Swiss-Prot record:
<dbReference type="InterPro" id="IPR023828">
    <property type="entry name" value="Peptidase_S8_Ser-AS"/>
</dbReference>
<keyword id="KW-0479">Metal-binding</keyword>
<dbReference type="GO" id="GO:0046872">
    <property type="term" value="F:metal ion binding"/>
</dbReference>
<feature type="binding site">
    <location>
        <position position="559"/>
    </location>
    <ligand>
        <name>Ca(2+)</name>
    </ligand>
</feature>
<feature type="binding site">
    <location>
        <position position="544"/>
    </location>
    <ligand>
        <name>Ca(2+)</name>
    </ligand>
</feature>
<feature type="propeptide" description="Removed in mature form">
    <location>
        <begin position="586"/>
        <end position="587"/>
    </location>
</feature>
<feature type="domain" description="Peptidase S53">
    <location>
        <begin position="219"/>
        <end position="583"/>
    </location>
</feature>
<keyword id="KW-1015">Disulfide bond</keyword>
<feature type="disulfide bond">
    <location>
        <begin position="352"/>
        <end position="391"/>
    </location>
</feature>
<dbReference type="GO" id="GO:0008240">
    <property type="term" value="F:tripeptidyl-peptidase activity"/>
</dbReference>
<dbReference type="InterPro" id="IPR030400">
    <property type="entry name" value="Sedolisin_dom"/>
</dbReference>
<feature type="signal peptide">
    <location>
        <begin position="1"/>
        <end position="32"/>
    </location>
</feature>
<keyword id="KW-0574">Periplasm</keyword>
<dbReference type="Pfam" id="PF00082">
    <property type="entry name" value="Peptidase_S8"/>
</dbReference>
<protein>
    <recommendedName>
        <fullName>Sedolisin</fullName>
        <ecNumber>3.4.21.100</ecNumber>
    </recommendedName>
</protein>
<dbReference type="Pfam" id="PF09286">
    <property type="entry name" value="Pro-kuma_activ"/>
</dbReference>
<dbReference type="GO" id="GO:0042597">
    <property type="term" value="C:periplasmic space"/>
</dbReference>
Length: 587
C-alpha cells in the first residue's frame, strides 16, 4: 500500500463547529415526552444535536417546534435477516464461490428478506395512531413515508424537534434518540427526516474552458466526454447499447434532457432513450434545481460519452427536493434498487459520514446498497471533493481531523476518487496524479476524497490491502476529476469545463456499462473481483504514484499500489476486458 499522511489521523467525532444554541437548558424533560408507561426500544437514529455538542454562539433561545408544525418522515424498516442478505451479496459477487453470479431476484427478496406485510402494517398502525397521514409503503417494503407534525413525532418516537443553527443555517433537529415501542423494536431501523439542515451536495467544480498546458507529465486540458474511451483504452470495447444505466438526481431534469440532446447532436450521436422517475411523494418538488443543473449535465453527458455514445436506456431517478433532510435521496436509491432495471447507477453526491450515521441514514441506505449488490447492481459514488475534510471543510481545513463522505464509505458501493489527467499531443493517456487544487479564496480545499470509515467495517475483499485495521477504506478506483482537465459539458446550452469527483464517477459508469454490454450484463457488483484481479495483475490499472489529498503537510500521499487518495488508480479497459474474457470474471 502507498504511504499515508505524514501526521497522525484523528477521527472526526465532534461534528459541529457552529451550532447556535445557548447552554442554559434545564433538561430535555422540559420538552415533554410520551407517557412513562410506554416501554421504548432504540432505533438507528441518534440525537442529532445534544447539549454536549452545543457551542453557545448566540443568544437565540432553544425552542421546540410547536406541536402543530408539519413534519415529513420516512421510516426505514429492518431486513428480516440482514446478516444473511449481506452474506449472499458477498457470495454472488465473489469469484470462486458456488453462488457466484446467482443474483437475488425481486420476488426472492420479498419472500426471504423484506419486512413482512404484518410487520409493515404494525408500523403503519403506530403512525396512524399518533396522527400521521398520507402513509405510503414502497413496493419492496423497506420504507414507509408519512406526513405529520412535531407533536406526532414526539408521540410516536419519543423525541422533540427543536430549532437550531448549523454553519449559519437555521433548521430543526431531534435532541434525543428516536425510539419506538418495544413491539416494533425488531422492525424499525431508522426514523429519517428528523433534521433538515445537513444535506448531500454535488461533487463538482465548474469553471470556464481553460487553455491547454503542456507540462512534463503531459498536456493538461479540457476534454470532450467522447475522448475518455480513447484515453482509458476502451475504444475496442462495444458501446453500452445493451445496458441500462441509472442516475440519481435531486429535483427535475428537463434542462438536462435539452442539454443532453445538444451534446449528442453536436457529436453526431444518436438521441438517448431516457426516462424520468419521481421517487418520492406525488406532491413533491420535481422542478429543475438550478444549483444542481451542472451536476446532472455532467453525469449524463459523461456517461454517454464514456459509454461510446450509446446506452440501452438512461433512467433519471429524481429525488423530491422538498423532502426533509436526505429522505428524498434515500427514496431515490431505494426506487432504483426496487425496480432492479439499471445495471449500474451513478451517484455524484455525498455528505459528512458522521451526520449520516447520526440521523440513521447510513444504516438505512446500507441496507438498500447491500440489496443492490445481492441483485448484481453496482452503485458508483463520488468519493468527495473535500480531500480528507468532508465534515469540516468550511473555511480553512482542520489539520489532522480527517473524515470521509457518505455514501462513498459504504462497502456496498464502488467509491470513485479523482485524478489530474495528462494526455499526449495525440490525445492518448500519458499520466495521472492525485487531484488537489489547494485552497480557494474562501479557504475551502478542492481535492479528491479518501480515507477510512469510522462506522463501516472493512469488507473481506479489502484484505489484500493494508491501511487502518478493520475499517472500510476508500476510494476503490479513480478517474479524471481536475477542473483544469475536466469535461466540456453543455450547461444551459453553453459549454463549461467541469471537474470534481462528480466527473470521475460517471466516467467509470459509462466504461463499466460497456463491459456489461460486452458480457451480456452478467457482471455483478465488481469490488471483490477488482481487488482480487488488480492485486495480482497490476497492469489492469494506471497506478497513480504522486500527489496528496490534504493541505499543509496533512492528508494522505500516493505511491505504488492501492492508496487513500486514488485507490488502485484508473482502469485500463482493454486490459480489464481481456482479463475478464480469460479468467471468467463475472461469469
Amino acid at each position: 500500500m502507498k504511504s499515508s499522511a505524514a501526521k497522525q489521523t484523528v477521527l472526526c467525532l465532534n461534528r459541529y463547529a457552529v451550532v447556535a444554541l445557548p447552554l442554559a437548558i434545564a433538561s430535555f424533560a422540559a420538552f415533554g415526552a410520551s407517557p412513562a408507561s410506554t416501554l421504548w426500544a432504540p432505533t438507528d437514529t441518534k440525537a442529532f444535536v445534544t447539549p454536549a455538542q452545543v457551542e453557545a454562539r448566540s443568544a437565540a433561545p432553544l425552542l421546540e417546534l410547536a406541536a402543530g408544525e408539519t413534519a415529513h418522515i420516512v421510516v426505514s424498516l429492518k431486513l428480516r435477516d440482514e446478516a444473511q442478505l449481506k452474506q449472499l451479496a458477498q457470495a454472488v459477487n465473489q469469484p470462486g464461490n458456488a453462488q457466484f453470479g446467482k443474483f437475488l431476484k425481486r420476488r426472492q427478496f420479498l419472500s426471504q428478506f423484506a419486512p413482512t406485510e404484518a410487520q409493515v402494517q404494525a408500523v403503519v398502525a403506530h403512525l396512524r395512531k399518533n396522527g400521521f397521514v398520507n402513509i405510503h409503503v414502497v413496493p419492496n417494503r423497506l420504507l414507509i413515508s408519512a406526513d405529520g407534525s412535531a407533536g406526532a413525532v414526539k408521540a410516536a418516537f419519543n423525541t422533540p424537534l427543536v430549532r437550531y443553527q448549523l454553519n449559519g443555517k437555521a433548521g430543526y433537529a431531534n435532541t434525543a434518540p428516536a425510539q419506538v415501542p418495544q413491539d416494533l423494536g425488531e422492525i424499525v431501523g431508522s426514523v429519517l427526516g428528523l433534521q433538515n439542515v445537513t444535506r448531500a451536495h454535488p461533487m463538482l467544480k465548474v469553471g470556464e474552458r481553460s487553455a491547454a498546458k503542456t507540462l512534463a507529465a503531459g498536456t493538461a486540458k479540457g476534454h470532450n466526454p467522447t475522448e475518455f474511451p480513447t484515453i482509458y483504452d476502451a475504444s475496442s470495447a462495444p458501446t453500452a447499447a445493451n445496458t441500462t444505466v441509472g442516475i440519481i438526481t435531486i429535483g427535475g431534469v428537463s434542462q438536462t434532457l435539452q442539454d443532453l440532446q445538444q451534446f449528442t447532436s453536436a457529436n453526431g450521436l444518436a438521441s438517448v432513450n431516457t426516462q424520468t422517475i419521481q421517487t418520492g411523494s406525488s406532491n413533491g418538488d420535481y422542478s429543475d434545481d438550478q444549483q444542481g443543473q451542472g451536476e446532472w449535465d455532467l453525469d449524463s453527458q459523461s456517461i454517454v460519452g464514456s459509454a461510446g455514445g450509446a446506452v440501452q436506456q438512461l433512467l433519471f431517478y429524481m429525488a423530491d427536493q422538498s423532502a426533509s433532510g436526505n429522505t428524498g435521496l434515500t427514496q431515490a436509491f431505494n426506487q432504483a434498487v426496487s425496480d432492479n432495471v439499471a445495471k449500474v447507477i451513478n451517484v455524484s453526491l455525498g455528505w459528512c459520514e458522521a451526520d449520516a450515521n447520526a440521523d440513521g441514514t447510513l444504516q438505512a441506505e446500507d441496507r438498500i446498497f447491500a440489496t443492490a449488490a445481492a441483485q448484481g447492481q453496482t452503485f458508483s459514488v463520488s468519493s468527495g471533493d473535500e480531500g480528507v475534510y468532508e465534515c469540516n471543510n468550511r473555511g480553512y481545513p482542520d489539520g489532522s481531523t480527517y473524515s470521509v463522505s457518505w455514501p462513498a464509505s459504504s462497502p456496498n458501493v464502488i467509491a470513485v476518487g479523482g485524478t489530474t489527467l495528462y494526455t499526449t499531443s495525440a490525445g492518448a493517456y500519458s499520466n495521472e496524479t492525485v487531484w488537489n487544487e489547494g485552497l480557494d479564496s474562501n479557504g475551502k480545499l478542492w481535492a479528491t476524497g479518501g480515507g477510512y470509515s469510522v462506522y463501516e467495517s472493512k469488507p473481506s475483499w479489502q484484505s489484500v490491502v493494508s491501511g487502518t485495521p478493520g475499517r472500510r477504506l476508500l476510494p476503490d478506483i479513480s478517474f479524471d476529476a481536475a477542473q483544469g482537465t475536466g469535461a466540456l459539458i453543455y450547461n444551459y446550452g453553453q459549454l463549461q469545463q467541469i471537474g470534481g469527483t462528480s466527473l470521475a464517477s460517471p466516467i467509470f459508469v459509462g466504461l463499466w456499462a460497456r463491459l456489461q454490454s460486452a458480457n451480456s450484463n452478467s457482471l455483478g457488483f465488481p469490488a471483490a473481483s477488482f481487488y482480487s484481479a488488480i492485486s495480482s495483475t497490476p497492469s489492469l490499472v494506471h497506478d497513480v504514484k504522486s500527489g496528496n489529498n490534504g493541505y499543509g503537510g496533512y492528508g494522505y500521499n500516493a505511491g505504488t499500489g492501492w492508496d487513500y487518495p486514488t485507490g488502485w488508480g484508473s482502469l485500463d479497459i482493454a486490459k480489464l476486458s481481456a482479463y475478464i474474457r480469460s479468467n471468467g470474471f463475472g461469469h
